[in-house]
Amino acid sequence: MTNIIELPEVLANQIAAGEVVERPASVVKELVENAIDAKSSQITVEIEESGLKMIQVTDNGEGMSHEDLPLSLRRHATSKIKSQSDLFRIRTLGFRGEALPSVASISKITIKTATKEVTHGSLLIATGGEIETLEAISTPTGTKIKVENLFYNTPARLKYMKSLQAELAHIVDVVNRLSLAHPEVAFTLISDGRQLTQTSGTGDLRQAIAGIYGLNTTKKMLVISNADLDFEVSGYVSLPELTRANRNYMTILVNGRYIKNFLLNRAILDGYGSKLMVGRFPIVVIDIQIDPYLADVNVHPTKQEVRISKERELMALISTAISESLKEQDLIPDALENLAKSSTRHFSKPEQTQLPLQSRGLYYDPQKNDFFVKESAVSEKIPETDFYSGAVDNSVKVEKAELLPHSEEVIGPSSVKHASRPQNTFTETDHPNLDLKNRQKLSQMLNRLENEEQSVFPELDYFGQMHGTYLFAQGKDGLFIIDQHAAQERVKYEYYRDKIGDVDSSLQQLLVPYLFEFSGSDFINLQEKMALLNEVGIFLEVYGHNTFILREHPIWMKEEEIASGVYEMCDMLLLTNEVSIKTYRAELAIMMSCKRSIKANHSLDDYSARNLLLQLAQCQNPYNCPHGRPVLINFSKADMEKMFRRIQENHTSLRELGKY
């Protein structure tokens, strides 16, 4: 008697379903991909209870014949490949013949389909993979597949499902990715009778992006294009000022298939170079057309991982396309704008005769307790803004009512502000150790700063500066060299930390409400977690498609911080599933101190330099900037004498002393 048996087909399909069907979103993905392969131009996805109760996908594609319909539930039965050679030149999204049998084995499935060649269609009903009904019916050309009671016979899988809102967010994300991959198809997603996504299907990728991420986001995206003999790269990338807290907004498409690829993600970030802040990621939609022989999609059950030949060449192509596109934009603010913390750009060129003969310098204002640039040639006043240079511009209004097609309440065009995402204020080269996305590392930094003890600072006598970066001072312990940027970062950090430490739970009504726009999946996740935002005084109301409105703000948040602050709190919530005023304010103090500190290569006059050292001496910890870098180093008199060999020690080299 043999111990090895061939598994029944239904059981084999259920085992395969464990790899192919992880959650309701997996079913939506497989059914929609089949509809795309059937050359559909319109696809409608309807779901109930986040797909656990019902998923229905309707398309106007080629349909199936009466003879092919029962074969579609047979494992490894497919119309997309017929020979081994076809496996290496796949242009369809599906090809294994596993998805539909796997879905049918763990649900009740109803299929209505018809082709153009016949006068009638077909109906198939199956439960648990067993066909119960197969008959001729009257139905339009195309296919309608309804999946009900998903996982009814695999209760263990149901146990690992997340909340309905979380599962719905996964479905929205799948439909959004497929919409971006195929802008020529009109997609509609309806959940419990409510329309969540709709694209026009015009073939214009920019319109598809606008339908998913919103018109305001699309306006801040640049077109990219590059090609060589093997690859053709095109798509859209966001300006460096428009970023998100994770990589979820980076979409890479290969021959119309959404894939995940770490190296290509790295190439995208390399294309931005130092223009992105550490821990921030751009919004990217990149379409790569490639010879199927150079891409192996048969390496993962969900086909989201693809092996690509000549991957290094493709990485270089992507990086070059992005960097060249960004070069054409005016991304670098002038020094005066940066130091004055202005959010308004002035592009008028002064005449050469108006330029001063002396070099630009930094000066200290004791009344304002801050540094400023004295520039006689500049006559126009630049308004001061806070922390984020990307804070909301009061001149930005909602100009067209059609931007809010589903508003429950009509608000005049000039009575709301569109909140802007915060711009990057410093780059990886400023602080390579600061990663706001690494919550564990950030938490360690905040704990270290919180537990700092009062330090005693030596009395210093300033006497000079080098390269507009380092200050020289002497004390009784010898020579001190101070990093002026790190020094003022420490001063500013402790100032902002103390200033914004108190939190008031009161709310203040906004004269002009703010609108906050999110992607479909983030919008759904935030609705589920809104109670956590309410606990810290942020009350967002649903206002139209993927949009919230804020009518009042907590007192602890300044009005000029509202746009950037609310987005930061929402990003924190989406990233960590928690939101903390303490963490937000600590991060804010760190980043404000960096933003508002003097940079390298700026000369200080003697008064400003001496005043900076006096402020530094009053700090709780004057020896390190908030990121942990040293503020100053010391050479004692003995060190100096050893370096100049005024002191010789027997049998001890200068290198062993570590001082030369």
Swiss-Prot record:
Gene Ontology molecular functions: ATP binding; ATP hydrolysis activity; ATP-dependent DNA damage sensor activity; mismatched DNA binding
Domain of life the protein comes from: Bacteria
PROSITE patterns found in the cross-reference section: DNA_MISMATCH_REPAIR_1 (PS00058)
Q: Which residues form a coiled coil?
A: none
Which keywords label this protein? DNA damage, DNA repair
Family (UniProt): Belongs to the DNA mismatch repair MutL/HexB family.
Q: Which HAMAP family has this protein been placed in?
A: DNA_mis_repair
Name of the featured protein: DNA mismatch repair protein MutL
According to the entry, what is the taxonomic lineage of the organism?
A: Bacteria, Bacillati, Bacillota, Bacilli, Lactobacillales
Q: Which gene encodes it?
A: mutL
